[in-house]
Amino acid sequence: MTTKYTIGVDYGTESGRAVLIDLSNGQELADHVTPYRHGVIDQYLPNTNIKLGHEWALQHPLDYVEVLTTSVPAVMKESGVDADDVIGIGVDFTACTMLPVDEEGQPLCLLAQYKDNPHSWVKLWKHHAAQDKANAINEMAEKRGEAFLPRYGGKISSEWMIAKVWQILDEAEDVYNRTDQFLEATDWIVSQMTGKIVKNSCTAGYKAIWHKREGYPSNEFFKALDPRLEHLTTTKLRGDIVPLGERAGGLLPEMAEKMGLNPGIAVAVGNVDAHAAVPAVGVTTPGKLVMAMGTSICHMLLGEKEQEVEGMCGVVEDGIIPGYLGYEAGQSAVGDIFAWFVKHGVSAATFDEAQEKGVNVHALLEEKASQLRPGESGLLALDWWNGNRSILVDTELSGMLLGYTLQTKPEEIYRALLEATAFGTRAIVDAFHGRGVEVHELYACGGLPQKNHLLMQIFADVTNREIKVAASKQTPALGAAMFASVAAGSEVGGYDSIEEAAKKMGRVKDETFKPIPEHVAIYEKLYQEYVTLHDYFGRGANDVMKRLKALKSIQHRPSSLLT
């Protein structure tokens, strides 16, 4: 049989990427990136003077379609592969990135009567303006003793589906009423390829409080939140929920023509970017924590028993690999913190030095920071620049840096920020391990492990665990392509399980990062100081961060409202 291929399409925060994969060995033959034309919409609605509120983050749904019609033909052209040999396509997406659609699956923001209402647009994963709704959900769930709450670490996030839906209902009831279904973007883009809406078990479980055995929370719970929400799950969240690796449908002829593929090939059900990466590094068994590292980190771990772990984002049966419980935790900002510092916290002299040496500022700071010993800077940071996802699940927290002096240098700050993100991961590892969900080794994928060796060594030292790094630079896309091979099946040259696909296609580099014992000892002391700050500012002893944010929010309002 001739070699067969699938395509994985990875939808990130700023762009989408298509990768063409050889199913015999997981090698990437071609990849292409399409930046989102509208990017992240967080100031004004496109082509209007309508200003968005504090902590809003929207996107334009047609940017997602453009990825399919631009990047997929590009990888076909670059590779020279015959369309007859491409047997399937799979996608992964940021989550919870959601949108309201009408009866035809049309996003409401594309309808003339709703285009000027921000609530009709795609709400990106990092839209945090529904925090008050998340707080109310958590309070009600705790008051009623809802069984689902411990499965999400005791708190539902403002980033997730129900909080965002409730915000729409409360602030734009006309949009809510016009909505036929609220969809994850990953399910919506699959529907654009297949002509039918199929919902995946991953986002339903991790982002919409769905349980394989129990379903959604009861109508009574939703009625207690808001009587208008009573029938939400049987109306606007209705539909069958399908396991990962299943075939959502065949590629529509009109989309096939635009994408340069054959109509009818398998389209896998949607997936989440981070979760798709797990089999791409060959992980299909427990004890191995996979970190998808980029602007943020998503931590994923397989287990055999359902345990309650503080601050986990969820535990979902078959949520990552069929046959296991999939645990998820995360950090809301990692690469974003380093990028923020380089953009806003570095002097012109540092930029000049980088230019003279012919390197970028990140590389210069990494090189200088690598010459420092652990603890040498005298600095300690809390990595909450975009709130805390795990283990505190609180978007109202903010970043902190302690220990500045007049002698503090940029590279010292940079290293302290790297260390802070490692401490955040250590807190997550300890939370899992302490509840019997064992973590023996770490796997890293995404952009950061490929670029920043110092960061990976610090993570190994702080967690005192060996770290293996993905051989692929595009692990979510590779994982999406692997699930596409399962959706296609062995009869046409694919695989019959994700475990089979992972054995052939999942890969890690030969080089690993091992803990350095003398560094481990120093970082243990620093980590204990981190825990002290973490608990003091994060568990209610001093809510100064929240008070500052509240004051900022008041001052952010138009002057006419400041009375």
Curated annotation (Swiss-Prot):
Pathway: Carbohydrate degradation; L-arabinose degradation via L-ribulose; D-xylulose 5-phosphate from L-arabinose (bacterial route): step 2/3. One of its GO terms (biological process) is L-arabinose catabolic process to xylulose 5-phosphate. Keywords: Arabinose catabolism, ATP-binding, Carbohydrate metabolism, Kinase, Nucleotide-binding, Transferase. It is an enzyme of class 2 (transferase). One of its GO terms (molecular function) is D-ribulokinase activity. It catalyses: D-ribulose + ATP = D-ribulose 5-phosphate + ADP + H(+); L-ribulose + ATP = L-ribulose 5-phosphate + ADP + H(+). The keyword ATP-binding applies. HAMAP family: Ribulokinase (MF_00520). This is Ribulokinase.
